[in-house]
Amino acid sequence: MKVTPDTPGRDDPGPGRRIGLDVGTVRIGVAASDRDARLAMPVETVPRETGMKGPDRGDIDRLIDIITEYDAVEVVVGLPRDLQGNGSASVKQAREIAFRIRRRLTATGREIPVRLGDERLTTVVATQALRASGINERDGRKVIDQAAAVEILQTWLDGRATALNTLPETPHTDEKGNFPR
């Protein structure tokens, strides 16, 4: 079944930090952006406690604390898809965590958008980056989740910058991020 992630930049809440989440069955990787929403950085790995049924557990509490601590204006939860855009078995889990976060934020009077961002190949890219840095998969499982969250969020931030035409200007590019001729 085809699943479609949200589009970066659509109904954008404006400047401010974003939180990215890589939801797994055992852990949730967390990343945060800078205030300018240009660069994603790892934050922590939260042990997964909340299941598909039953009450929110400590993991949701911790995620809400992080969102509050970073004064986030948007949360991006990775939507697991294959290269053809079909949803994996983990789609329900990602949507469930997104729903629970949205519900808790709304209950506390905070209308922070919770989006579903494209997660294709993020764990693969994160694993390759860790291997290249000398960390093996077994030793780096918790770090892999954070690195995957960074990939999810950075992909979102880059898409947002393109959609809003706010690519950073460098000495080699003009104000729109284009290379001079």
Swiss-Prot record:
It is an enzyme of class 3 (hydrolase). Keywords: Cytoplasm, Hydrolase, Nuclease, Ribosome biogenesis. One of its GO terms (biological process) is rRNA 5'-end processing. Its EC number is 3.1.-.-. The keyword tRNA processing does not apply. It comes from the Bacteria. One of its GO terms (cellular component) is cytosol. Residues 1-20 are annotated as: Disordered. It holds the Pfam family RuvX. This is Putative pre-16S rRNA nuclease. It is found in: Cytoplasm. GO terms for molecular function: nuclease activity. It comes from Corynebacterium efficiens (strain DSM 44549 / YS-314 / AJ 12310 / JCM 11189 / NBRC 100395). Belongs to the YqgF nuclease family. InterPro entries: RNaseH-like_sf (IPR012337), YqgF (IPR005227), YqgF/RNaseH-like_dom (IPR006641), YqgF/RNaseH-like_dom_sf (IPR037027). Its main location: cytoplasm. Could be a nuclease involved in processing of the 5'-end of pre-16S rRNA.
